[in-house]
Swiss-Prot record:
It is an enzyme of class 3 (hydrolase). InterPro entries: Daa-tRNA_deacyls_DTD (IPR003732), DTD-like_sf (IPR023509). A motif (Gly-cisPro motif, important for rejection of L-amino acids) lies at residues 137-138. SUPFAM superfamilies: DTD-like. Keywords: Cytoplasm, Hydrolase, RNA-binding, tRNA-binding. Pfam families: Tyr_Deacylase. CDD domains: Dtyr_deacylase. It comes from Marinomonas sp. (strain MWYL1). The keyword Transmembrane does not apply. Belongs to the DTD family. The gene is dtd. It is found in: Cytoplasm. This is D-aminoacyl-tRNA deacylase. A Gly-cisPro motif from one monomer fits into the active site of the other monomer to allow specific chiral rejection of L-amino acids.
Amino acid sequence: MKVLIQRALNACVVVDGETIGAIDHGQLVLVGIEKGDTEVDTQRLADKLLKYRMFGDEDGKMNLNVQQVAGGILLVSQFTLAAETKKGLRPGFSTAAIPEEGERLFNDFVNKVRAQYSKVETGRFGADMKVSFTNDGPVTFMLD
C-alpha cells in the first residue's frame, strides 16, 4: 500500500462535471492498493497519515499534523501508484490489487481515517476523476 500525501492550500475532485469532494487547507492523499495489502496496512497507514507532522509550527518547523491545524483530508484512490516502472517504457500493473479488493481496502482505509477525524472527503473509486489542487511548499511525502 502506498499513500502519497501532499500539503495543499486547496484541493477538489470532479467526476462527470460534478465536484464530489473538496477541501481547503490540508492534505491531498493519493492511495494505491497493492496485492497482498490487508487491513493491518490500512490501519497502520491511517494512523500514520493522521499523525504525520508536515505542517509548520510558529517557527516554521514541520511539527504539526493535519488535525492540529484543523486541515481537511481529500482521499483519492489511484491504482497507478502500484505500477511497476523499473523495466521498459510503459508501466505494468501486475502488482496492483484487483479492483474488487482495491475498492474494499480503499473503503476500509477511508473508514479508519474517518473514525479518527471528521474533516475527510473522498473521490470515487474506479471513476475517471479530475483532481485539482494547489501544492503548499511544495511538500509531498510517500508513505508505505
